[in-house]
Amino acid sequence: MTTEPLYVKQLSIVSFGTKSIELSGESNTLEALDISFENEILKTGEVVCKMYAPNIKEIDITGNISTKSYSLGKCFPKAKYIYLYDTNVGKSGTLDGFQDIETLFISGKKVTDMNLSFLSGITIHRLEIEKTKISKLDMAPLRKTKLNVLDIDNCPIKKLMLLPLKNTGIVSLSISNCYITSLNLKEVSNKTLTTLSIINCPLKKLDVSPLKNTLETLYVGDRQQFYTKYREVYKKTKFTTLDLSMMKKLKEVYGSGAGSIKTVRLKNPKKHVRVKTLQELHLYGTKIKSIDVSGLTKLKKLYVGNCTTKCNINKCTKLEELGIINRGTTDLSLKSKSLKHLQYRGGKVKKLSVKKCPKLYAVTIRGTKAKSLDFKGNKNLLYLSIYNSNIGKVVYPKVKKADWRYEYKIQDKRFSSDPITNAEESGIFTYEHYLGGYNINQVKTVDISAWKRLSSAMKKRQLANGYKFVMKQYTPRRIIINKKLRSSDKKWIRAVAKKIKAKVIMW
């Protein structure tokens, strides 16, 4: 198929059967080009480019570049945004001639080698290379660029020299799912690098101290969402210690799934230093047994597990979210005036107390066999979810907020509109989908004696999750009510109890 796009601004071609797409002619109006092959011919389909479009700004090609093509840079010299998916990058020199690239994305298992010399002297800001067979990558040509973001993912690279990036103005460096065993961050210890991501690489040691004056965000694993458990353990990760004690500007550390980590150092008594700026620390799926975060006065979010038996959150006066996967403790009492969200998982715990957490707003508990959970004093608790547990008794609070019914609608709407927490394809769900009020599974006794009058919101959102117990096998055997409960509510409770074969007890 031959195409001559003379007067259009945007050209999009999808091939369902034609194995070759040839572009020829000249166009001064074309600004965007999008070409792709369907899966059946993706491996063999190729683009033959022999056209000239000097004003094109964006190129998006999924498929191979034919060896018969002219250099893409000579065809589209002023292209700023170039995305090449499942490509082979074509013959040597296929990318020569570009004058003003800002973003370049390349992926494809047929890419086995790449010479970055075509980028030398260009003001490129973002370079992403993923899912290739490149084992060596010479960064020297990037020395004279203005590269801000470098992202390398799923490439068999074993060694990477970072020195050429030192003066480019690099802001974000990401290396994931590669075979790099060592990394010298002194080579990029400039004044600009604020985000570092090193995930699932067989590094035996990771020293981030050279970035102590600039680094703000560190990824060695995943960021944890409050309403999900961690989804993946990175098996390539080898380093066991993560020393953060020297960091002066570090705000977020995301390490969920980094299964090799046993120790996180937050202070160094010998050097009289400690990290003070941390706001988020995500360490689900690690081998950390104990952690003392008491000195982190700015900490807002903490997730730690799977082997944790001790966690000191004293003096964390701004802590709002806490997630613990606890394998050893049988008695856990939390005390925090700021804590709003608690996620807890621990099969051995027999007593879990949160009565000294007055601002507690949402609680989700998994895999617990505590005899009782008393939330009577938690009068701000609007969301409670218990899964895969065997709880003897749960005592509900009487929510003190006058507008708590309206609060449900506000929060459900807020979380439904959040593109991160609403991403179902990632296993992340909204408040409404995941909790929707008090959702109790496998609890023998439900105590609602704090209530003397049941509003419609309380019935719908707390007690019966939409006026009905959804899963009959998980309904309570006993419901404790206040003997002063108004008669109409007693009647409603008895009707519900009869339906689920539960006993009503006056208190």
Region annotations inferred by a language model:
Residues 1-43, 47-68, 73-80, 215, ...:
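LRR N-terminal entry segment and analogous cap-like coil->beta motifs
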Residues 376-423, 471-507:
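Leucine-rich solenoid repeat scaffolds
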Residues 5-8, 26-31, 52-57, 75-80, 195, 216-217, 230-232, ...:
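Leucine-rich repeat
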Residues 4, 72, 97, 185, ...:
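Glycine-centered beta-turn/loop sites at beta-strand termini
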